[in-house]
């Protein structure tokens, strides 16, 4: 039985808010058990997660979506299914690419040992080890380091390695080395899974300019919005604009780049501003003095559209995209104190996942913001995420929509 239901016909995402049909997630595996105090900064975590609780929290998040009929695809299952369906040559390339990209770099002897170890496992277990890391005890080799292959503990943030853009994808070059290997799985499934192999790529990690999915938004079928952030550069967005412009089948007419604070704990646009309904947006007031906007004209901007500074304030900019007056909801609500705004911004208070217009999922810990959303007519489906939030992401970070219904604007 395929990970995809019978309704899935390939990538189709033309909004942030259309009814969610198919979504990619990853329940944290053994990889989070290998986070140690000495490596917190390197692995991009604020604290060590309690693994059992983190998994229970993630299961609660997934249950909310499954209970509403959403086809929830687990990354491990998708990669394993793709591997079983792939040609012998594709399987070999997948394993060899993994070995070449492994951190730390493998000696020839360890490369041989890891290859044999992986190929001795059933497919699903093999993929789990590729994601979680491999110790010297599991491999049966002598080493000063316990880990022969490092873990990928950020994999539960499926938003970032690639993004669904219309009927295509952007597969990313991640800013930090610890996350770059994550795109191996996206590259493999989009080259080899029968349901995904024909998907056009608008960005390839071989382009080696940083961009991550938490910065990529599809506001409607004409406009992309991309963050200029701690993880994504304006020059990368310029290259993306050129790539999209060059594809004659793409409908998008405009890209808007939004500058946000370059904070390591709030690293993407979706930790500062998100779209939750046809005209309702949630934002952090902390970013007010940093917001700056550039326009890319994909219709009249020539073969290589360049960023044009747009001097509009946030509300007028959003109005120019959605063609109506936006409702701007600040984190914590209109009466929130600076401390309340700072606390709820820190725990990704803007990072909700819309599963229908005005129906969103997010952490229960951001109580002030949840109340403000309710007052603005947004329905919040809350879940407990005190452990998951230590990885610095909320529901949007932990999901990559693969298909949404089109919105009737």
Curated annotation (Swiss-Prot):
Major enzyme class: hydrolase
UniProt entry tagged with the keyword Hydrolase: yes
Enzyme Commission numbers on file: 3.5.3.6
InterPro entries linked: Arg_deiminase
Sorted UniProt keywords: Arginine metabolism, Cytoplasm, Hydrolase
Pathway in which the depicted protein is active: Amino-acid degradation; L-arginine degradation via ADI pathway; carbamoyl phosphate from L-arginine: step 1/2
Cellular localisation: Cytoplasm
Catalyzed reactions: L-arginine + H2O = L-citrulline + NH4(+)
Family per record: Belongs to the arginine deiminase family.
Protein name (Swiss-Prot/TrEMBL): Arginine deiminase
Gene transcribed to yield this protein: arcA
């Amino acid at each position: 039985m395929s990970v995809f239901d019978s309704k899935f016909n390939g990538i189709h995402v033309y909004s942030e808010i259309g009814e969610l049909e198919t979504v990619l997630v990853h329940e944290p595996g053994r990889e989070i058990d290998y986070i140690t105090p000495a490596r917190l900064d390197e692995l991009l975590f604020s604290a060590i997660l309690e693994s059992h609780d983190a998994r229970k929290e993630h299961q609660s998040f997934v249950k909310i979506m499954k209970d509403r009929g959403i086809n929830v695809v687990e990354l491990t299952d998708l990669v394993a299914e793709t591997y079983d369906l792939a040609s012998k040559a594709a399987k070999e390339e997948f394993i060899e690419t993994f070995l070449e990209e492994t951190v730390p770099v493998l000696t020839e002897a360890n490369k041989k040992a890891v290859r044999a170890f992986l190929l001795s496992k059933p497919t699903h277990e093999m993929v789990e080890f590729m994601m979680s890391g491999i110790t010297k005890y599991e491999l049966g080799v002598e080493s000063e380091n316990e880990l022969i292959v490092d873990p990928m503990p950020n994999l539960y943030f499926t938003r970032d390695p690639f993004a669904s853009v219309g009927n295509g994808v952007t597969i990313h070059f991640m800013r930090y080395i610890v996350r770059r290997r994550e795109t191996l799985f996206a590259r493999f499934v989009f080259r080899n899974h029968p349901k995904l192999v024909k998907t056009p790529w608008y960005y390839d990690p071989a382009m080696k300019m940083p961009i991550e999915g938490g910065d990529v938004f599809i506001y409607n079928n004409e406009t992309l919005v991309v963050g200029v952030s701690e993880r994504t550069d304006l020059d990368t967005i310029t290259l993306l604009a050129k790539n999209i412009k060059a594809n004659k089948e793409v409908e998008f007419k405009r890209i808007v780049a939004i500058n946000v604070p370059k904070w390591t704990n709030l690293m993407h646009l979706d930790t500062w501003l998100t779209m939750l309904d046809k005209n309702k947006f949630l934002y952090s007031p902390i970013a007010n003095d940093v917001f700056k906007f550039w326009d890319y004209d994909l219709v009249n901007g020539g073969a290589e559209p360049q960023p044009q500074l747009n001097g509009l304030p946030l509300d007028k900019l959003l109005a120019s995209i959605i063609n109506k007056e936006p409702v701007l909801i600040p984190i914590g609500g209109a009466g929130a104190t600076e401390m309340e705004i700072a606390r709820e911004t820190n725990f990704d208070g803007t990072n909700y996942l819309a599963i229908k217009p005005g129906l969103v999922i997010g952490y229960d810990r951001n109580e002030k913001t949840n109340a403000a959303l309710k007052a603005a007519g947004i329905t919040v489906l809350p879940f407990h995420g005190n452990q998951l939030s230590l990885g610095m992401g909320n529901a949007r970070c932990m999901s990559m929509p693969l298909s949404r219904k089109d919105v009737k604007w």
